[in-house]
Regions:
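Acidic Gly/Asp/Thr-rich repetitive segments characteristic of extracellular carbohydrate-active
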Residues: 62-99
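N-terminal Sec-pathway targeting helices
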Residues: 4-23
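Extracellular beta-strand/beta-solenoid scaffold signature
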Residues: 119-127, 147-155, 170-177, 197-207, ...
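Functionally critical loop-and-helix segments that line ligand-binding/catalytic clefts
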Residues: 41, 47-53, 58, 290, ...
């Protein structure tokens, strides 16, 4: 009898644990769907969590103050802020100022050349918890280096702010926006701390924020410009180099990435679970190394990629399960994709992408598909392929026969990662030549463009001097 009661209790406990696990999986699935389809405001509107405040630092203000190290003669910034009236202007003459600074009301800080705010190597330098705040012409340096408290030059929680012509040096994070809408971040120079790439902070981190304009900034040696759960932001005219991700979108919809120059980053632009994005008029170059990608997609839909110059990357475009929406489409139009190791690399034989009027020039391989599959389920129409071997006898600008790309012995390095070491090596090229000559097995058709252009389309690539929409 006792053993029967124990068995019954064990069964009840197992049932309870299983029910908790199922409930957790259901809640996780709901959260994923909410993020995927842009349902942003569940917790904000219900008031469950106030994300507008920075995460608390476990150290007291007295402990932080004791840790800060400032240059001799630095003037404390906070008393100057406190003495400025609501809506007033704080003019900072040349000199050294000691952080931190907390702005909790509408005001402007206008710095003269040589005005420097030093963070003392601890915490964030300026925190903005108010709307309609402007900071112009200031140099901010030496934030803390703790990721768990997001030590930044400027932490922004307000709306309708303006942050222009500032210099950010040796700060872990540059700008950190959280529930901060419709701000302008323009013409700032941003560099992170001298740390390994993965340990640096983000130049600009946008979380849960809408309608911000990030333009004409000069960013180098940071980690990412990352946009999470944020929509309708415009990232334009920036120069981003020597970082990890130039721009990284996650669960972020309706954003525009226009007229930027991405140089020598690990990845130029990467979309993860991001829909309705515009990637237009960008120069994306020298994303090299094993992870090098010019533009990457992971389960992202309804993206326009147009008039970009995608040059000299390990992979010009990388596609993974995109578009994810069964009714969605990604469009690639009028891009110059040139001198890459692989122009377009598909992780699988996914469908729903259209490539029209692009110029493929000087790539070692135009298109690859992992897993011995093909890209035929995507639309290829009217592109220029520099290895096209047909004629244009009627002079209509299009080839008389379709362009076809086949895989022969090069299937080896497409499917076996270790074999990529031999890509373009004489040994593998010789095998490929013999394979084509003897046709010992049936090659695989990778793609067919039924109306290939006979010359590169006029106007492909970045439109110089034109304003993006």
């Amino acid at each position: 009898m006792a053993s029967g009661r124990i068995t019954l209790a064990a069964r009840r406990a197992a049932t309870f644990v299983a029910a908790i696990a199922v409930a957790g999986l259901v809640l996780y699935a709901v959260a994923q769907v909410a993020g995927r389809f842009g349902v942003y405001d569940l917790t904000r509107d219900a008031g469950f969590t106030d994300h507008s405040l920075p995460p608390p630092d476990p150290r007291s203000e007295q402990e932080l103050e004791a840790l800060r190290r400032f240059p001799p003669g630095a003037t404390k910034l906070q008393p100057l802020i406190d003495a400025t009236a609501t809506g007033g202007v704080l003019t900072l003459p040349p000199g050294l100022y000691a952080a931190p600074g907390l702005i909790d009301r509408k005001m402007r800080i206008e710095a003269q050349t040589g005005a420097i705010v030093d963070g003392g190597g601890v915490g964030s330098i300026i925190t903005v918890n108010a709307d309609d705040v402007s900071i112009t012409g200031l140099t901010l340096r030496n934030s803390g280096e703790r990721h768990e408290t997001t030590d930044a030059a400027i932490r922004l929680r307000g709306r309708h702010g303006s942050f222009k012509d500032n210099v950010i040096e040796n700060c872990l994070f540059g700008f950190e926006l959280k529930q901060a809408d419709r701000n302008i971040i323009r013409r700032n120079r941003i560099a992170s701390r001298e740390l390994p790439e993965a340990l640096r902070g983000d130049a600009i981190r946008v979380w849960y924020s809408t309608g911000n304009v990030i333009e004409d900034n000069d960013i180098e040696r940071t980690r990412d410009v990352v946009v999470w759960y944020a929509k309708d932001n415009r990232i334009a005219g920036n120069r981003i180099r020597d970082s990890r991700y130039g721009v990284h979108l996650m669960y972020a919809h309706g954003n525009a990435i226009e007229k930027n120059h991405f140089l020598s980053n690990t990845v130029g632009v990467f979309l993860m679970y991001a829909n309705d994005t515009k990637i237009v008029d960008n120069v994306i170059t020298y994303s090299q190394g094993p992870s090098g990608i010019g533009v990457g997609f992971k389960e992202s839909s309804n993206t326009l990629v147009a008039h970009n110059d995608i040059f000299a990357n390990a992979r010009g475009v990388f596609m993974d399960a995109s578009p994810y929406d069964p009714e969605g489409f990604n469009r690639f139009e009028m891009n110059r994709i040139a001198y890459n190791g692989v122009a377009i690399a598909f992780h699988s034989d996914w469908e729903g992408n259209a490539f029209e009027r692009n110029a493929f020039i000087g790539n070692h391989r135009a298109v690859t598909v992992a897993g011995a599959r093909s890209a035929k389920r995507n639309r290829w129409d009217g592109n220029y392929w520099d290895d096209y071997e047909g004629f244009d006898r009627d002079s209509d600008g299009k080839g008389d026969t379709p362009y076809e790309s086949w895989s022969w012995a090069d299937r080896l390095w497409m499917d076996v990662p270790d074999a990529q070491f031999f890509r373009a090596a004489p040994s593998l090229e010789a095998i490929d030549f013999v394979e084509r000559l003897g046709a010992f097995h049936e090659p695989q058709l990778i793609l067919r463009d039924s109306a290939p252009l006979f010359s590169a389309p006029q106007g492909a690539g970045v439109r110089r001097g034109e304003k993006s929409s």
